[in-house]
């Protein structure tokens, strides 16, 4: 083994297995691009993004950690979200929850 080396098993690594997911259509109604990161509480994303915020409470993008999705001005796209896990508490972001989700 080389110092710092990471040895993984053969094959693909599946993310978020058996976690609730949902697909939502999102439109950027603003005049600037908007990026949403992998672990951002999606319901609190930029207000220029139009989608059902109530439906997305407690969800984040179902993408690899450290990545983001970019919404260009006027663009609409469908994204897949995955339920937050752990304690299911949300603090910060846009300050709209500041506590337990459930």
Curated annotation (Swiss-Prot):
Q: Which domain of life is it from?
A: Bacteria
Cellular component, GO annotation: urease complex
Query: Which EC numbers characterise this protein's activity in its record?
Result: 3.5.1.5
- Span-the-membrane segments of this chain are none
Query: Could you tell me which Pfam families the record lists for this protein?
Result: Urease_beta
Instruction: Report which reactions are catalysed by this protein.
Output: urea + 2 H2O + H(+) = hydrogencarbonate + 2 NH4(+)
> GO molecular-function annotation terms?
urease activity
Which pathway? Nitrogen metabolism; urea degradation; CO(2) and NH(3) from urea (urease route): step 1/1
Q: Which family does it belong to?
A: Belongs to the urease beta subunit family.
NCBIfam families, A to Z: PRK13203.1 (NF009682), urease_beta (TIGR00192)
> What name is this protein filed under?
Urease subunit beta
Species name: Acinetobacter baylyi (strain ATCC 33305 / BD413 / ADP1)
Gene that this sequence comes from: ureB
């Amino acid at each position: 083994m080389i110092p710092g080396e990471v040895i993984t098993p053969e094959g693909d690594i599946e993310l978020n297995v058996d976690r609730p997911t949902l697909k939502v259509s999102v439109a950027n109604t603003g005049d600037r691009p908007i990026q949403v990161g992998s672990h951002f509480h999606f319901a609190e994303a930029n207000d220029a993004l139009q989608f059902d915020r109530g439906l997305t409470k407690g969800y984040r993008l179902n993408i690899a950690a450290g990545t983001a999705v970019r919404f260009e001005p006027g663009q609409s796209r469908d994204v897949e979200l995955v339920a937050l896990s752990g304690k299911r508490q949300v603090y910060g972001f846009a300050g709209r929850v500041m506590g337990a989700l459930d």
